[in-house]
Amino acid sequence: MNNRSAVRILRLPAVIQKTGMARATIYDWLNPKSPRYDATFPKKRMLGVKSVGWIEAEIDEWLSQRCKLI
């Protein structure tokens, strides 16, 4: 029996919905040249040539850590 849980990939609309943040904010957090860069925000993963996604567990952990800071 397999005890590992499946890795779930979230596309950008789901990340926007889960975080409550705008697309531009998320991409600012990912951009080291942006003054809004957040090194703790989970990195996007390339799913194909033009598609990216985020691992849901990483987004959930990031949100959990952010809640602890508030």
Curated annotation (Swiss-Prot):
One of its GO terms (biological process) is single-species biofilm formation. GO terms for molecular function: DNA binding. Keywords: Activator, DNA-binding, Transcription, Transcription regulation. Residues 12-31 bind DNA. It comes from the Bacteria. The keyword Transcription applies. The keyword Transcription regulation applies. InterPro entries: AlpA (IPR010260), Prophage_regulatory_activator (IPR052931). Positive regulator of the expression of the slpA gene. When overexpressed, leads to suppression of the capsule overproduction and UV sensitivity phenotypes of cells mutant for the Lon ATP-dependent protease. Part of the cryptic P4-like prophage CP4-57. Overexpression of AlpA leads to excision of the CP4-57 prophage by IntA. This inactivates ssrA (the gene upstream of the prophage) that encodes tmRNA which is required to rescue stalled ribosomes in a process known as trans-translation. This is DNA-binding transcriptional activator AlpA. It comes from Escherichia coli (strain K12). The lineage of its organism: Bacteria, Pseudomonadati, Pseudomonadota, Gammaproteobacteria, Enterobacterales.
